[in-house]
Amino acid sequence: MTLMNKSPQRIRHETRLRILEVVSVRPVTPLMLRITLGGDDLEGFASPGHGDHIKVFFPQAGEDIIVPVLGPEGLTFPAGVPRPEMRDYTPRYHDPRRRTLDVDFVLHGDGPASTWAAQARVGQKIVIGGPRGSLIVPDDFDWYLLAGDETALPAIGRRLEELPSTARAIAFIEVAGKDEEQVIRSSASVDIHWLHRDGQEPGNNGLLLDAIKAAELPDGDCYAFIAGESSMSKAVRAHLVSERSFKDEWIKAAGYWLRGVADAHEPH
């Protein structure tokens, strides 16, 4: 690969908490819902990076939303009331003019996020915080590699949609089955490889790593975004560096979840 100075730039944002309400709920696939949030609190919201994440505060069952206080020592919650569950989510699409924000939720299990999303109705309120920062990746790499499972699909889909027409991208996306494939529109030259688990366990099947190992990848300078189960992301990164001669600083490998751990999200 040709050595070039294309280091991604990290920027920080003022951390704010926002009270939003559900504007619409619509299925993207049988196992993924797109929930549009809106409200005047989105004034000043910024999310320039496809890998950004917001913190969503899910109230306990039967409880109203709770807005913590953000101070120098972090978040402080009111005493005597159940704390909300907090999870990280990708801002899928932000419309500053309409003051709306799309967030995609994977429906799996009975965790707080899936449970809330499955019952979400127009007018319900929810609290979000962030993003605290963004990683800005230049648009002039020779090509882009994106790989991940359903948890990474909002970030991958957003990146593909935001790439310019001059860009080239190859994506490997692991989903439960063919019904979980999504329509992703992009101006760039995009090649998407959908990998179906078809009953295999997520995060423990080798689908993504095996597919990337077997792929004939282009020459040139590449930026790689890998996200999903933590051990998978690390294994793909190791393969790209040791066997494909990718520059480590041109790889973002994020662990969005960890097998056997209910709430595991590496900072990014």
Predicted feature descriptions by range:
Residues 1-268:
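Extended, composition-driven regions rather than compact fold-specific motifs
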